[in-house]
Amino acid sequence: KLRETDDEEKRKYLKSSLPAITVSGVFSKRRADSLIRPSNLICIDIDGKDNPSISDMEKFKKRLAELPYVMYCGLSASGKGAFCIIPYDDFGKHKLYFNALQREFKEMEIIIDSSCSDICRLRFYSYDEHPYVNWDAEVYTHTMEKTNIAHLKSKEVFSKRRDWLI
């Protein structure tokens, strides 16, 4: 039903009624300081509305699956975006991994949702008939203290490969 409606209020309601998890760990409360057991996974969202030049999410998912550190890639609950689950090795550096991923994806001209920097971010269940799963994905090791992607020179961004955009 969520993927069938264009009514934004109805979409929000339907999405909020879906089962959900916190990908990055088990929490006693949904607060960063309430982490009980980390999973050493980060989930990033790539929304279609933020990336209008991506016209085919299925083809785009296949491109994301080529990244050696992507463990899982699937369609978002709306079907208009994608998400990736990526392993890392130090939960204390969650935001630093996110910053590096945000920069790396920006260089590929892909905007990832900045709210994914939150270690207790909720991930709503979504169905994907053709998810990508790689149990042998590489552990992501890059970190970055701060991300200042808004100030990247356009030459830096647009000199990167445009073949990511489908």
Describe each model-derived feature in a short phrase.
Residues 1-80, 87-100, 157-161:
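Signature for HUH/AEP ssDNA processing cores
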Residues 28-52, 88-165:
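DNA replication initiation modules
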Residues 75-82, 117-121:
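Short Gly/Ser/Thr- and Asp/Glu-enriched loop/turn motifs at secondary-structure junctions
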